[in-house]
């Protein structure tokens, strides 16, 4: 490296996250796209409230994939699954897979939910807006759940199922994406409870 030349850090040494744009203004401050080589902070951002927003989106996805019973605590294995899935996404869509992940998160996070309100012994559902942080958490959970359910008792690997889920969610395809289907279901229930 020559003097004065900038060091370019790419995710897994392959993908640049500086060109990725977040279209949803409410999620801009909650989606971290800081350049990292390997998305592993070893829990540094779990001490304070809302510090998880400083964590790279791919690491948050890895943490949600680790929450399943099979992959609990196996971060290296999950990161290799995500790397393989991002390679499949890049080959299939011919665009930056980190952009596909961000688009999938924007399309699969519900904007409206219901909460249970008890008034005078009578309980009913009330529609409420969802905070951007909860919206992202729900999107991560549904994407990882859709991928693990797709791979369960299937010939497809978890990486292929994750790639399918990310591509379908980035296109907001309700027929193929578990996460988008769940989002639409929650918003439909919330709309009926207005």
Curated annotation (Swiss-Prot):
GO molecular function term, any single one: rRNA binding
Keywords: Ribonucleoprotein, Ribosomal protein, RNA-binding, rRNA-binding
One CC-aspect GO term: small ribosomal subunit
Superkingdom of origin organism: Archaea
CDD domains reported for this sequence: uS7_Eukaryote
Pfam family, one: Ribosomal_S7
One biological process term in Gene Ontology: translation
Known function: One of the primary rRNA binding proteins, it binds directly to 16S rRNA where it nucleates assembly of the head domain of the 30S subunit. Is located at the subunit interface close to the decoding center.
Matching NCBIfam families: PRK04027.1, uS7_euk_arch
Family statement drawn from the similarity comment of this UniProt entry: Belongs to the universal ribosomal protein uS7 family.
Assembly: Part of the 30S ribosomal subunit.
Protein name according to UniProt: Small ribosomal subunit protein uS7
Species for this entry: Methanococcus vannielii (strain ATCC 35089 / DSM 1224 / JCM 13029 / OCM 148 / SB)
């Amino acid at each position: 490296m020559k003097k004065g030349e900038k060091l370019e850090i790419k995710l897994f040494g392959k993908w640049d996250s500086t060109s990725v744009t977040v279209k949803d203004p409410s999620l801009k401050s909650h989606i971290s796209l800081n350049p990292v080589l390997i998305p592993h902070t070893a829990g540094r951002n779990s001490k304070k409230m809302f510090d998880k927003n400083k964590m790279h989106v791919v690491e948050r996805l890895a943490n949600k994939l680790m929450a399943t019973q099979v992959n609990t605590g196996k971060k290296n294995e999950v990161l290799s699954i995500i790397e393989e899935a991002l390679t499949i996404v890049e080959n299939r869509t011919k665009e930056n897979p980190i952009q596909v992940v961000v688009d999938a998160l924007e399309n699969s996070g519900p904007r409206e939910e219901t909460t249970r309100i008890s008034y005078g012994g009578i309980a009913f559902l009330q529609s409420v807006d969802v905070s951007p942080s909860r919206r992202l958490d729900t999107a991560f959970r549904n994407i990882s759940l859709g991928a693990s359910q797709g791979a369960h008792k299937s010939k497809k690997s978890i990486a292929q199922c994750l790639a399918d889920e990310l591509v379908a969610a980035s296109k907001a395809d309700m027929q193929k994406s578990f996460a988008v289907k769940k989002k639409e279901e929650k918003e439909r229930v919330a709309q009926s409870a207005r």
